């Protein structure tokens, strides 16, 4: 586990997420070996051989501050595509049936545009969500869900399950997104992963959102 230097954080924030709050990455170490891992909130790297249950051992801020620095450990980081899921769970099929028959991930879906006054929600385990900018915009390549789908989620633990998040800590910070009309979006269905069923609607803001379109977060119960 490594706390990423600010240069790596900036690099990751210029690239798309793999899902809400995380990126699947390949790291090149200083000895030129490569390792796969997950970057949480573009600032904490957990390698694949490390148990994700580490994220439950303390608060996120404590884990981040106690992690070893990436300085002198990493040469480069790049976001890599998620492996495709071959079969859909019953919950995914059910959600897809109720949502325009779309069964694949948002990144593979055709681009559409938002209608006037549409509302979206983003669930995060990180109060200081780095995809949300100081001007109230959402960075390009960020994920959220529809307001309707978010109504299925009452706790942060339910968000982890429905959106198949790799960080098992409750995603109990909920941001509200009200993009301008004609903002580019892609809709999909979250695939099962990380021992979670998925099945929720995912929305990819490929070009981000405008200033003053993201508010929050409000805090929902952890479980």
Model-derived segments and spans:
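Motif-centric detector for short Cys/His coordination patterns
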Residues: 1-79, 83
